[in-house]
Amino acid sequence: MNNLLKLDTYSFDEKCVYCRNKLVLEKYCFYGWRYLYECRCKKCNKNFLIDMPIFSGIPYPAVYDKDKKKVVNDVADWWKDPLENINLRIVHENIISYLNINIVRKKLIVFNLLDFVFGHCFMRLEGLTYYIDNEEYKEYDFLVVIPSQLRFLIKNFENKISLIETSTSFSKYRYFYTCIDREIKNIIQNYCDVYCEMLKYPQQEFVRLAKLNIPIRKWVNEIDKIVIVYRKDRIVGVTNKSQYIFYKKLILMLKSLNTKIFLIGDKDKYRFANVYDLRVEKIDPDIDDIWNETCSGSITIGVHGSNMLIPSICSSYNIEFVNTDKLYNFGQATAFLENLNQQETIQKYRYIYGNEYLSNIDPKMVYALVKSIVVKMNYVFNAVRHEKFDDIDTIRKLYQMANNCKLTYSFYDKINSIICKIRKFINI
């Protein structure tokens, strides 16, 4: 039970930042992304909003002085700023698009899957799967607050939970929604004991993905498709036009490998010949299933980020373009699967490093890496299955050829950065 926070006055143990006197809990606030205690100090006569300790691995809690209208303790700016502007960020618009409540037992666990980053939402969802069909928690009902973009993943167990689905863009989950607060409070009053699941992330290993609606194929005997995850907001190069040129060159080279080439993601004005273009301008309810099935058993290629999380889970091999600023969040944006040993992880995940704009990544290098996987597929497959194979030197040479090209900053990098900014300004 150490992953669960019980909502009662006995478990509340926050102290005043000024006098260290124990605070009095007034009420809970379930505003969406962040859950808050509203409390006061009898001695100082101060009123506060304090983060509930349901997040692990982030700089909580922020302590907001309601009288001063500011966060009065030392926390990271990205965590502090939304709370300091809470009066401007409280939203009364109803974003609840679906509600299904099934009250059976006397105990409830609330799972908050909302976040402004897709990868964070997904990690919380994977944590939820631990509780589904777990005998240890058979005496509990589960209330899941989920963004509409992830609902398709819970088809396999949606009938076992109560559900609040919300519909808005991920970026807007930085706001505080009164409709969510009101609905959760209406539900929890029907229970004797209520708990919030305490998130444990950054998490670097996903072990219960079989319960989710994802077509995972870790290994295949032969690669017959390559999937490019195409984004307008995460691009290779300085502009969308330069990204188009990059992928056009890469696709021309990939055609020589006799594999099907698919594009998924954002549709823009640029078109590609001789590919299966599954990009869309607007997400519809079925497109995620189509994309995931397309990625299943493939080589996926794209710019590093949580947008690559599910494609990398479904695929047999994953190639991501990374600038050095993104190294810190590998654990949050990469799915290290259950039972993958070190050798298997090296096989599955490949990273190609570039500058800030990824403009110095050569399509020829990417092609060489893809070819090393496709052409030597049988060697690789035998290696990860721990069977005997003879061409170990060839495999090592192929790894070296596709080795990560980590760049160091120099005088030439500064010049290149200036050139990139000029190109971005004039859109070439």
Regions found by a protein language model. Name each.
Residues 3-13, 17-221:
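Secretory-pathway glycan-assembly enzymes, especially type II membrane glycosyltransferases
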Residues 288-335:
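A donor-sugar binding/catalytic signature common to diverse glycosyltransferases
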Residues 153-157, 269-277, 310-314:
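Short loop/helix-cap segments at secondary-structure boundaries that form the rim of catalytic
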Residues 121-131, 241-253, 284-294, 367-370:
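Well-ordered, non-membrane alpha-helical segments in soluble/globular domains
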Residues 182-214, 332-428:
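Leloir-type glycosyltransferase catalytic cores
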Residues 113, 144-147, 229-230, 263-266, ...:
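Short His-Asn-centered micro-motif
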Residues 106-112, 196, 224-235, 264-266:
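Short loop/turn segments at strand-loop or loop-helix junctions that form parts
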Residues 146-149, 228-287:
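Catalytic donor nucleotide-activated moiety binding site of glycosyltransferases and closely related
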